[in-house]
UniProtKB/Swiss-Prot annotation:
Organism the protein comes from: Mus musculus (Mouse)
UniProt entry tagged with the keyword Coiled coil: no
Name of the protein described by the UniProt record: Protein Noxp20
Region (Disordered): 1-87, 102-126, 165-208, 404-439
Highest taxon above the source species: Eukaryota
Length: 569
């Protein structure tokens, strides 16, 4: 083909290229506009269309004449990207042969490619719409739950009469946090796409929607859990405070429980107080304090041990009763009640006939009676210490009374023989004889309190030994009702002996202190009577501590008779 023919063909191709933008297909317009050198723009292409650019460039290289392609290469080489990035797919060398005829088949892939580019964006828009709808729904649910919890807490505070304004600040914190979460995520401001940016592809839109939904669900769960726990804690605390303040019996019951103490605790406290008082006084003489003397003779220790034994026996009785039911339970209850009635009858008898107590008995008579009663209990206990204490108390009282009577007789004879001046000369002799045998009022008072404390301590010790032997060392089993009656006789004899001793002590005080003033003598006499009454009370309380011990003994005896109950131990 000649040169003229080539020029003619080139001109024809140029005219065809100029007429192509007038085509009706929008896909062809877009493709040709991108391929033309005049359409080169300095604006950066979106990231979503970076993958489409190499294909379009290749297609343009195939359908563009060499002259135009060279010009586009030169212009592209002169221009640099705005972002400073150089892409490898921007310039593609045309190595294939260029056809001068228009390729009609290239129009169809361009249309399909354009449709493929449009479909992901529309799909992403639909995903973003669903994401915003879900986030708005969860946000509204979170806000509703937060407001509900706040309303519950406010209602509880109003019901419990809580008017403190400071309590409102911690209550409003969870609600503000929930409102802040719901306010940051709104349907109008979608975090997956900006207001002016094009929609992302389908995969990016779905990932953004899922992450947003996950964050909202996590925040909602945290707010619901935290708010619920705070509400429950708030209601519980305020309820307990109101109950403690409004219940009239709550404080009274608590006070009574704190004041409830045992007899041994009271005696120990009295002992400690007396020690503190004596520590402040720099005295060497022995003082007549009943609590300290009672502890010196180990009465307090035996009383505490008896209390512990009684409490353990009581717990055993209760645990055994819970293991029974029906007829067996009723029979056992009747037996235990009958044992208790014996002790109750003894208390009422002591209150009704207090004048029968305090019958005077000699030390030998009391020792004989005590030995017989212990033998009836079938326990190997000998009252040696108690008998010695009783004998010691009776001996010094009798000795003091004899000395006082001799001194009184001598004084009366001398008064009859001599009068006037002779009386003045004989007064020193009377003082010498009296000082040798007779005791002073303070000494008699001291011996009285000491004897009462020693005798009472020995009585408590004897009852403690009897309780131990009833539980663990009986030679022969005896019905609990009979043992209860014997124990009542034993404690009655002890109380009568203590009362008799206190009366003897007061008589001795009155005789020795006949020359003393009433202001000095009467407090001593009253103190001896008071300590004697306290001693009998301690012995009676120790008897009541033996009731659970006898009940346990009866349960064991009944179990041995049945010989078929595994609960017996």
């Amino acid at each position: 083909m000649s040169d003229d023919a080539r020029d003619t063909i080139a001109n024809g191709v140029g005219e065809d290229a100029a007429e192509m933008p007038n085509s009706d297909s929008p896909a062809e317009d877009a493709a040709e506009v991108q391929c033309g050198p005049a359409t080169t723009s300095n604006e950066p292409a979106p990231d979503d269309h970076m993958e489409e650019q190499p294909e379009i460039t290749a297609m343009c290289a195939e359908s563009t004449p060499p002259g135009i392609l060279d010009q586009s290469k030169a212009s592209a080489a002169d221009e640099t990207p705005l972002n400073g990035e150089v892409t490898e797919d921007t310039l593609v060398e045309c190595v294939d042969s260029v056809s001068l005829e228009g390729d009609t088949g290239s129009e169809i892939p361009l249309k399909e490619q354009d449709d493929a580019a449009v479909d992901p964006s529309s799909q992403a828009g639909r995903w973003a719409g669903w994401g915003s709808w879900g986030k708005s729904l969860l946000s509204s649910a979170s806000a509703t739950v937060g407001h509900g919890l706040t309303a519950v807490k406010e209602k509880a505070g109003a019901t419990l009469r809580i008017h403190s304004a400071n309590s409102a600040s911690p209550e409003g914190a969870p609600t503000d946090a929930e409102n802040g979460i719901s306010g940051n995520v709104t349907p109008d401001q979608d975090p997956a796409r900006g207001p002016h940016t094009p929609p992302p592809p389908g995969a990016a839109g779905s990932r953004g929607m899922l992450s947003a939904l996950t964050n909202v669900v996590q925040n909602t769960g945290k707010s619901v859990l935290t708010g619920g726990l705070d509400a429950l804690e708030f209601i519980g605390k305020k309820t307990m405070i109101v109950l403690a303040e409004s219940d009239p019996g709550f404080k009274r019951t608590k006070t009574l429980m704190e004041r409830t103490v045992s007899l041994s605790q009271m005696l120990r406290e009295a002992k400690e107080k007396e020690k503190q008082r004596l520590a402040q006084q720099l005295t060497v003489e022995r003082t007549a304090h009943y609590g300290m003397l009672f502890d010196e003779y180990q009465g307090l220790s035996h009383l505490e041990a008896l209390e512990i034994l009684s409490n353990e026996s009581e717990s055993k009785v209760q645990s055994f009763l819970t293991s029974l039911d029906g007829e067996k339970l009723e029979l056992l209850k009747n037996d235990l009640i009958s044992i208790k009635d014996i002790f109750v009858a003894k208390e009422s008898e002591n209150e009704a006939n207090p004048e029968e107590q305090g019958l005077e008995e000699s030390g030998e008579e009391f020792a004989r009676m005590l030995t017989e009663l212990l033998f009836e209990l079938h326990v190997a206990a000998t009252p040696d210490k108690l008998n010695k204490a009783m004998k010691k108390a009776h001996d010094w009282v009798e000795e003091d009374q004899s000395v006082v009577s001799i001194d009184v007789a001598k004084g009366s004879e001398e008064e009859e023989k001599e009068e006037g001046k002779e009386e003045k000369a004989e007064e020193p002799e009377e003082d010498k004889t009296g000082g040798q045998g007779a005791k002073t009022v303070e000494e008699v008072y001291m011996l009285s309190i000491e004897s009462l404390a020693e005798v009472t301590a020995r009585c408590i010790e004897q009852l403690h030994k009897v309780a131990e032997l009833i539980l663990h060392g009986q030679e022969e089993e005896k019905p609990a009702q009979d043992q209860a009656r014997v124990l009542i006789k034993l404690t009655t004899a002890m109380c009568n002996e203590v009362t008799s001793l206190s009366k003897k002590f007061t008589n001795s005080l009155t005789t020795v202190g006949s020359n003393k003033k009433a202001e000095v003598l009467n407090p001593m006499i009253n103190s001896v009577f008071l300590e004697g009454s306290n001693s009998t009370t301690y012995v009676q309380d120790a008897l009541q501590l033996l009731l659970p011990v006898l009940q346990v003994s009866h349960i064991r005896t009944s179990c041995l008779k049945a010989t078929a109950q595994p609960d017996c131990s």
